[in-house]
């Protein structure tokens, strides 16, 4: 998957080029906020495993090719542990100096539009106090479905087709 927008290139990270994500490792709190880790640290081995088993997308600026962040599409599972076809949960993170400039809205919207063309459902879980992520999800046509115990909200992207 490779998507180009006005300002960005969003493309899949493969295990062999996961080292390009090294600049993100110093922002461990972003991985926690994105729900990708609850304890411990994310390292290149962890990212390599994610790149092999899930869909890890890097976000880069078109002109400079500078790494801005990640979008990760995680398989969704039913109650028996079986993978739900055509359904992903999204997690994302952006370098702090690049936040609040519309980059994540632009990237996530483009990715979701591409997935929508294949009738793929995208959901997200976000803490109720994470106003920035809630704003991104709202701007990308997600709607709040439910609030779970622990202030975790479940959002689902509306079908745009």
Model-inferred region functions:
Residues 28-48:
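Conserved GNAT-fold acetyl-CoA-binding loop/helix
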Residues 51-55:
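PAS/PAS-like sensory domains
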């Amino acid at each position: 998957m490779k998507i180009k927008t006005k300002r960005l290139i969003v493309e899949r990270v493969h295990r062999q080029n996961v080292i390009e994500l090294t600049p993100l490792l110093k922002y461990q709190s972003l991985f926690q906020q994105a729900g990708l880790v609850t304890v411990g640290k994310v390292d290149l081995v962890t990212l390599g495993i994610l790149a092999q088993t899930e869909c890890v997308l890097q976000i880069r600026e078109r002109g400079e090719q500078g790494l801005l962040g990640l979008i990760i599409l995680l398989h969704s599972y039913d109650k028996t542990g079986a993978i739900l076809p055509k359904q992903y949960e999204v997690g994302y993170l952006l370098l702090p100096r690049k936040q609040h400039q519309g980059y994540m809205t632009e990237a996530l919207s483009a990715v979701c539009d591409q997935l929508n063309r294949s009738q793929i459902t995208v959901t997200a879980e976000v803490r109720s106090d994470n106003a920035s992520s809630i704003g991104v999800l709202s701007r990308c046509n997600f709607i709040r479905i439910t609030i779970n115990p622990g202030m975790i909200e479940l959002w689902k992207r509306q079908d745009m087709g």
